[in-house]
Amino acid sequence: MFGYVIPNQAALSPEAQARYRSAYCGLCRRIGALHGLRGRLTLSYDLTFLDLLLSSLYDGETALHTGADHCPIHPIRKVDWRSSGPTDYCADLSVALHYYNAQDKWNDDRSLLGLGFEALLAAPTAAAVERWPRQCSAIRACLDRLTQYEAEGSEDLDAVSGCFGDLMAELFDYKQDHWSPELRSIGFHLGKYIYLLDAYDDLDRDLKKGTYNPLRSLHQLPGYEEEMREIFELLLANCARSFERLPCVEDVDLLRNILYSGVWLKYNCKHAKNPPRAAE
Protein backbone atom coordinates (compact mmCIF):
# COMPACT_ATOMS: atom_id res chain seq x y z
CA MET A 1 0.00 0.00 0.00
CA PHE A 2 2.96 2.27 -0.64
CA GLY A 3 4.26 4.04 -3.72
CA TYR A 4 1.17 5.90 -4.94
CA VAL A 5 2.09 9.43 -3.81
CA ILE A 6 4.70 10.11 -6.46
CA PRO A 7 5.81 13.09 -8.54
CA ASN A 8 5.04 13.40 -12.24
CA GLN A 9 8.66 13.66 -13.32
CA ALA A 10 7.75 14.50 -16.91
CA ALA A 11 6.01 17.69 -15.77
CA LEU A 12 8.85 18.87 -13.50
CA SER A 13 11.67 21.18 -14.45
CA PRO A 14 15.21 19.81 -14.09
CA GLU A 15 15.60 22.00 -11.00
CA ALA A 16 12.43 20.62 -9.40
CA GLN A 17 13.49 17.06 -10.21
CA ALA A 18 16.81 17.74 -8.49
CA ARG A 19 15.05 19.14 -5.43
CA TYR A 20 12.83 16.08 -5.20
CA ARG A 21 15.83 13.77 -5.47
CA SER A 22 17.65 15.69 -2.75
CA ALA A 23 14.64 15.31 -0.42
CA TYR A 24 14.31 11.62 -1.26
CA CYS A 25 18.02 11.06 -0.63
CA GLY A 26 17.84 13.15 2.54
CA LEU A 27 15.09 10.94 3.93
CA CYS A 28 17.02 7.80 2.99
CA ARG A 29 20.13 9.19 4.67
CA ARG A 30 18.27 9.99 7.91
CA ILE A 31 16.59 6.57 7.96
CA GLY A 32 20.06 5.06 7.68
CA ALA A 33 21.48 7.30 10.39
CA LEU A 34 18.66 6.50 12.81
CA HIS A 35 17.93 2.88 11.96
CA GLY A 36 20.83 1.48 9.96
CA LEU A 37 20.95 -0.11 6.54
CA ARG A 38 17.93 -2.31 7.31
CA GLY A 39 15.85 0.79 7.89
CA ARG A 40 16.64 2.07 4.41
CA LEU A 41 14.61 -0.81 2.99
CA THR A 42 11.50 1.10 4.11
CA LEU A 43 12.17 4.23 2.05
CA SER A 44 9.05 5.28 0.13
CA TYR A 45 7.75 8.08 -2.04
CA ASP A 46 4.75 8.50 0.26
CA LEU A 47 6.85 9.50 3.28
CA THR A 48 9.00 11.69 1.03
CA PHE A 49 5.84 13.64 0.22
CA LEU A 50 5.03 14.03 3.92
CA ASP A 51 8.59 15.20 4.57
CA LEU A 52 8.34 17.78 1.77
CA LEU A 53 4.97 18.99 3.06
CA LEU A 54 5.99 19.34 6.71
CA SER A 55 9.40 20.81 5.87
CA SER A 56 7.69 23.46 3.73
CA LEU A 57 4.97 24.23 6.28
CA TYR A 58 7.40 24.49 9.19
CA ASP A 59 10.19 26.06 7.15
CA GLY A 60 12.57 27.99 9.40
CA GLU A 61 11.47 26.32 12.63
CA THR A 62 14.25 23.72 12.46
CA ALA A 63 17.71 23.79 10.94
CA LEU A 64 18.07 22.77 7.31
CA HIS A 65 21.00 20.46 6.60
CA THR A 66 22.38 19.91 3.11
CA GLY A 67 25.30 18.07 1.62
CA ALA A 68 26.51 15.59 -0.97
CA ASP A 69 27.68 12.08 -0.09
CA HIS A 70 28.25 8.60 -1.40
CA CYS A 71 25.80 5.93 -0.27
CA PRO A 72 25.26 2.18 -0.73
CA ILE A 73 23.11 2.85 -3.80
CA HIS A 74 25.48 5.47 -5.24
CA PRO A 75 28.97 4.32 -4.23
CA ILE A 76 30.80 6.15 -7.03
CA ARG A 77 28.97 9.43 -7.62
CA LYS A 78 28.03 11.70 -4.75
CA VAL A 79 24.36 12.63 -4.49
CA ASP A 80 22.90 15.83 -3.08
CA TRP A 81 20.68 15.56 -0.02
CA ARG A 82 18.76 17.83 2.34
CA SER A 83 16.94 17.22 5.59
CA SER A 84 15.30 19.09 8.47
CA GLY A 85 13.41 18.29 11.67
CA PRO A 86 10.42 16.67 9.94
CA THR A 87 12.78 14.38 8.04
CA ASP A 88 13.69 12.50 11.22
CA TYR A 89 9.99 12.25 12.04
CA CYS A 90 9.25 10.72 8.63
CA ALA A 91 12.24 8.38 8.99
CA ASP A 92 10.75 6.99 12.21
CA LEU A 93 7.28 6.67 10.68
CA SER A 94 8.75 4.85 7.70
CA VAL A 95 10.15 1.98 9.76
CA ALA A 96 7.06 1.84 11.99
CA LEU A 97 4.64 1.62 9.07
CA HIS A 98 6.58 -1.15 7.41
CA TYR A 99 7.03 -3.02 10.69
CA TYR A 100 3.32 -3.11 11.51
CA ASN A 101 2.48 -3.94 7.89
CA ALA A 102 4.94 -6.86 8.00
CA GLN A 103 3.44 -7.95 11.32
CA ASP A 104 0.01 -8.11 9.69
CA LYS A 105 1.33 -10.08 6.72
CA TRP A 106 2.70 -12.71 9.08
CA ASN A 107 -0.41 -12.82 11.27
CA ASP A 108 -2.85 -12.89 8.33
CA ASP A 109 -1.04 -14.91 5.68
CA ARG A 110 1.83 -16.56 7.56
CA SER A 111 4.12 -14.77 5.12
CA LEU A 112 7.73 -15.69 5.83
CA LEU A 113 8.79 -12.46 4.16
CA GLY A 114 6.55 -10.59 6.58
CA LEU A 115 8.01 -12.49 9.51
CA GLY A 116 11.55 -11.71 8.40
CA PHE A 117 10.80 -8.03 7.87
CA GLU A 118 9.06 -7.85 11.25
CA ALA A 119 12.14 -9.27 12.98
CA LEU A 120 14.43 -6.98 11.00
CA LEU A 121 12.52 -3.83 11.98
CA ALA A 122 11.62 -4.67 15.59
CA ALA A 123 14.44 -2.68 17.21
CA PRO A 124 14.12 0.38 14.93
CA THR A 125 10.37 0.45 15.53
CA ALA A 126 10.84 0.25 19.30
CA ALA A 127 12.95 3.40 19.06
CA ALA A 128 10.29 5.10 16.92
CA VAL A 129 7.57 4.16 19.42
CA GLU A 130 9.52 5.85 22.22
CA ARG A 131 9.72 9.08 20.24
CA TRP A 132 6.23 9.04 18.69
CA PRO A 133 3.90 6.92 20.87
CA ARG A 134 0.70 8.61 19.67
CA GLN A 135 1.40 8.00 16.01
CA CYS A 136 2.67 4.45 16.43
CA SER A 137 -0.30 3.53 18.60
CA ALA A 138 -2.60 4.90 15.89
CA ILE A 139 -0.88 2.80 13.22
CA ARG A 140 -1.44 -0.38 15.21
CA ALA A 141 -5.03 0.49 16.18
CA CYS A 142 -6.08 1.47 12.65
CA LEU A 143 -4.51 -1.61 11.08
CA ASP A 144 -6.28 -3.77 13.66
CA ARG A 145 -9.62 -2.20 12.69
CA LEU A 146 -8.80 -2.73 9.04
CA THR A 147 -7.94 -6.38 9.68
CA GLN A 148 -11.33 -6.85 11.35
CA TYR A 149 -13.19 -5.32 8.40
CA GLU A 150 -11.24 -7.49 5.98
CA ALA A 151 -11.92 -10.63 8.04
CA GLU A 152 -15.64 -9.82 7.86
CA GLY A 153 -15.42 -9.34 4.09
CA SER A 154 -16.76 -5.80 4.44
CA GLU A 155 -17.55 -3.94 1.23
CA ASP A 156 -18.39 -0.69 3.01
CA LEU A 157 -15.86 1.42 1.11
CA ASP A 158 -16.21 4.45 3.36
CA ALA A 159 -15.63 2.48 6.56
CA VAL A 160 -12.83 0.28 5.26
CA SER A 161 -10.87 3.03 3.54
CA GLY A 162 -11.56 5.26 6.54
CA CYS A 163 -9.30 3.05 8.66
CA PHE A 164 -6.31 3.92 6.53
CA GLY A 165 -7.55 7.50 6.32
CA ASP A 166 -7.57 7.77 10.11
CA LEU A 167 -4.08 6.29 10.23
CA MET A 168 -2.70 8.82 7.75
CA ALA A 169 -4.51 11.70 9.46
CA GLU A 170 -2.67 10.88 12.68
CA LEU A 171 0.69 10.75 10.91
CA PHE A 172 0.17 14.04 9.09
CA ASP A 173 -0.70 15.73 12.40
CA TYR A 174 2.95 16.35 13.25
CA LYS A 175 2.69 18.84 16.11
CA GLN A 176 -1.00 18.97 17.06
CA ASP A 177 -1.04 22.73 16.54
CA HIS A 178 -3.19 25.24 14.66
CA TRP A 179 -2.37 23.55 11.34
CA SER A 180 -3.74 20.22 12.55
CA PRO A 181 -7.22 20.45 10.95
CA GLU A 182 -5.83 20.95 7.45
CA LEU A 183 -3.00 18.45 7.88
CA ARG A 184 -5.39 15.83 9.22
CA SER A 185 -7.76 16.46 6.33
CA ILE A 186 -4.98 15.98 3.78
CA GLY A 187 -3.85 12.79 5.49
CA PHE A 188 -7.37 11.41 5.89
CA HIS A 189 -8.47 11.89 2.30
CA LEU A 190 -5.10 10.88 0.89
CA GLY A 191 -5.15 7.74 3.05
CA LYS A 192 -8.60 6.78 1.76
CA TYR A 193 -7.41 7.40 -1.78
CA ILE A 194 -4.31 5.23 -1.31
CA TYR A 195 -6.34 2.36 0.15
CA LEU A 196 -9.00 2.42 -2.56
CA LEU A 197 -6.49 2.86 -5.37
CA ASP A 198 -4.55 -0.11 -4.02
CA ALA A 199 -7.77 -2.16 -4.04
CA TYR A 200 -8.56 -0.93 -7.57
CA ASP A 201 -5.05 -1.78 -8.73
CA ASP A 202 -5.08 -5.26 -7.14
CA LEU A 203 -8.63 -6.25 -8.09
CA ASP A 204 -7.81 -8.61 -10.98
CA ARG A 205 -5.15 -10.39 -8.96
CA ASP A 206 -7.39 -10.68 -5.89
CA LEU A 207 -10.25 -12.10 -7.96
CA LYS A 208 -7.96 -14.75 -9.43
CA LYS A 209 -6.55 -15.69 -6.03
CA GLY A 210 -9.89 -15.49 -4.23
CA THR A 211 -8.54 -13.03 -1.69
CA TYR A 212 -10.35 -10.12 -0.05
CA ASN A 213 -11.02 -6.97 -2.02
CA PRO A 214 -13.71 -4.43 -1.04
CA LEU A 215 -14.46 -3.77 -4.73
CA ARG A 216 -15.39 -7.41 -5.45
CA SER A 217 -19.13 -6.73 -5.85
CA LEU A 218 -18.99 -3.12 -7.00
CA HIS A 219 -16.86 -3.90 -10.04
CA GLN A 220 -19.65 -6.09 -11.45
CA LEU A 221 -22.13 -3.21 -11.54
CA PRO A 222 -22.71 -0.89 -14.50
CA GLY A 223 -20.81 2.36 -14.20
CA TYR A 224 -18.10 0.91 -11.96
CA GLU A 225 -15.23 2.74 -13.65
CA GLU A 226 -17.09 6.03 -13.63
CA GLU A 227 -17.99 5.67 -9.96
CA MET A 228 -14.39 4.91 -8.98
CA ARG A 229 -13.19 7.93 -10.93
CA GLU A 230 -15.71 10.13 -9.11
CA ILE A 231 -14.61 8.77 -5.72
CA PHE A 232 -10.95 9.39 -6.50
CA GLU A 233 -11.66 12.90 -7.78
CA LEU A 234 -13.65 13.80 -4.67
CA LEU A 235 -10.98 12.51 -2.28
CA LEU A 236 -8.17 14.33 -4.06
CA ALA A 237 -10.22 17.52 -4.34
CA ASN A 238 -10.57 17.50 -0.55
CA CYS A 239 -6.81 16.96 -0.23
CA ALA A 240 -6.09 19.87 -2.53
CA ARG A 241 -8.59 22.15 -0.79
CA SER A 242 -6.91 21.64 2.58
CA PHE A 243 -3.42 21.89 1.10
CA GLU A 244 -4.18 25.27 -0.47
CA ARG A 245 -5.15 26.62 2.95
CA LEU A 246 -1.63 26.00 4.26
CA PRO A 247 1.00 28.77 3.91
CA CYS A 248 3.51 26.55 2.08
CA VAL A 249 6.04 28.43 -0.03
CA GLU A 250 9.13 26.22 -0.24
CA ASP A 251 8.65 23.50 -2.86
CA VAL A 252 5.00 24.46 -3.32
CA ASP A 253 5.13 23.76 -7.07
CA LEU A 254 6.66 20.36 -6.38
CA LEU A 255 3.96 19.58 -3.82
CA ARG A 256 1.25 20.64 -6.28
CA ASN A 257 2.80 18.47 -8.96
CA ILE A 258 2.43 15.46 -6.66
CA LEU A 259 -1.09 16.26 -5.42
CA TYR A 260 -2.58 17.36 -8.74
CA SER A 261 -0.74 15.09 -11.15
CA GLY A 262 1.60 12.50 -9.65
CA VAL A 263 -1.04 10.76 -7.55
CA TRP A 264 -3.00 10.06 -10.73
CA LEU A 265 -0.18 8.30 -12.59
CA LYS A 266 -0.85 4.75 -11.37
CA TYR A 267 -4.60 5.17 -11.78
CA ASN A 268 -4.14 6.40 -15.34
CA CYS A 269 -1.82 3.49 -16.12
CA LYS A 270 -4.30 0.95 -14.75
CA HIS A 271 -7.27 2.66 -16.39
CA ALA A 272 -5.52 2.66 -19.78
CA LYS A 273 -5.11 -1.12 -19.55
CA ASN A 274 -8.75 -1.65 -18.55
CA PRO A 275 -10.92 1.02 -20.22
CA PRO A 276 -14.68 1.00 -19.48
CA ARG A 277 -16.71 -1.33 -21.66
CA ALA A 278 -18.84 0.44 -24.23
CA ALA A 279 -22.58 0.31 -23.61
CA GLU A 280 -24.27 -2.34 -25.72
Feature names for model-found ranges:
Residues M1-S185, K192, L196-E233, R241-D251, ...:
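Acidic catalytic motifs of isoprenoid enzymes
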Residues L254-Y260:
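Short, electropositive alpha-helical surface patch
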